[in-house]
Amino acid sequence: QKWENHTSISDNVVKFFKQRGISQKTLIECRITEEEYYQPQLNKKTNNIVFNYFYGVTLLNKKFRSANKSFTQCKNAKKVFYGINDIEGEKECYIVEGEMDKLALWEAGYKNCISVPNGANDLNDVFETCGDELKNIDKFFIAVDNDEAGKKLEKALINRLGKWKCSKIEFVNGKDANDELIHSVFSLEDALKNPIDYPVEGTFNAVDVWDDIL
């Protein structure tokens, strides 16, 4: 069967996403676009994948990703979670560290997911803008990267949201949700279906007691 591009973006970009396990259907539904834009790290204009940050019907920000993985955003844009509209009316929410991970969860059927726009940075601004949306969530699943930056973000998120409202998603076949998807969608689904509760201060389990005895 002949390959066809059903999106409004170029074949090369669509094929890049395909290599990362992201389908054309997800690209269309998540409104991924393509645009020439100045990349400060490259000191020139270049073609970019564009992740569009909507808040309601308003496009508040764009994040631009070049072919060599340089990133930039619109200047002075209001900070919001990527995908904030997708948790409207939800009681559970998955939080990831990057737009590709948000798309990975969408691909696996988990649409109630948001991504921080800039790691552990700018969280004050993001929470200020999106506080009303977050206060309606009963349970958060922290699905950030398995590295030092991810641990920093994880700590910042559970401190803000409350450890008792959060569970951790662990990825065993890579550092993040997109790596897990590339391994297989079943691997990603397995990780998402097996969250780990954070121990709350003042509580302990049998292993803790046994360690003390030994």
Feature names for model-found ranges:
Residues 38-138, 154:
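Phosphate-handling DNA/RNA-contact segment within nucleic-acid enzymes
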Residues 46-48, 128-135, 176-192:
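Short, surface-exposed amphipathic charged segments that create phosphate/polyanion-binding patches used
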Residues 93-95, 134-149, 169-170:
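Acidic beta-strand-to-loop metal/phosphate-binding motif
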Residues 1-56, 75-91, 193-213:
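TOPRIM metal-binding catalytic domain and adjacent DNA-binding surface shared by DnaG-type primases
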Residues 120-123, 144-154, 173:
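Acidic, metal-coordinating catalytic cores used for nucleic-acid/nucleotide bond scission
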Residues 113, 159-169:
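Structural alpha-beta junctions
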Residues 166-179:
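Conserved beta-strand -> loop -> alpha-helix junction used to position metal-binding or nucleic-acid-contacting
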Residues 130, 152-163:
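Short, aromatic/basic amphipathic alpha-helical patches
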